[in-house]
């Protein structure tokens, strides 16, 4: 049931602020680093670092993990690849923690962090391809979104 008209604007503003703040805390996948290293005429090593830039982890809650409803982060490499020597076209990297999961201790003018689940994950592929080949690396998870980068080998 709605509140009296005189208070409706206040209530809508509070609810909207909460919804926007909550949306900002959701997990957000990002591709931080990419590197291509040629090891031979048609052999390239492709590395990529995937991160969760959000506050919440990609699994959102421990309960989702317990119930088995949390989906892993998947990373794909597609494009003009002749073959994969190491790695596969689609890799599952599991969960990435968010900033909420970082163990931190505060002392006078000092912040230290302890062991915590990873916020980032680095993947490596060895691919057979031609120089100048175009590839697309995509990180995806239903709750954390999609991050895409295109590279020319």
Predicted regions: what they are:
Residues 1-153:
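C-terminal accessory segments enriched in acidic
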């Amino acid at each position: 049931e709605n509140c009296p008209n005189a208070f409706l604007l206040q209530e809508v503003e509070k609810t909207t602020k909460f919804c926007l703040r909550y949306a900002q805390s959701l997990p957000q996948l990002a591709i931080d680093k990419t590197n291509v290293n040629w090891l031979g005429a048609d052999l390239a090593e492709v590395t990529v670092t995937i991160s969760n830039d959000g506050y919440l982890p990609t699994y959102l809650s421990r309960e989702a993990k317990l119930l088995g409803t949390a989906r892993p982060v998947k990373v794909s490499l597609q494009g003009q690849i002749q073959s994969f020597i190491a790695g596969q076209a689609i890799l599952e990297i599991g969960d990435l923690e968010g900033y909420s999961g970082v163990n931190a201790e505060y002392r006078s003018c000092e912040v230290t962090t302890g062991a915590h689940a990873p916020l980032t994950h680095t993947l490596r592929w060895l691919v057979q391809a031609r120089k100048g080949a175009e590839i697309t690396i995509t990180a995806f998870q239903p709750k954390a979104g999609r991050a895409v980068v295109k590279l020319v080998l």
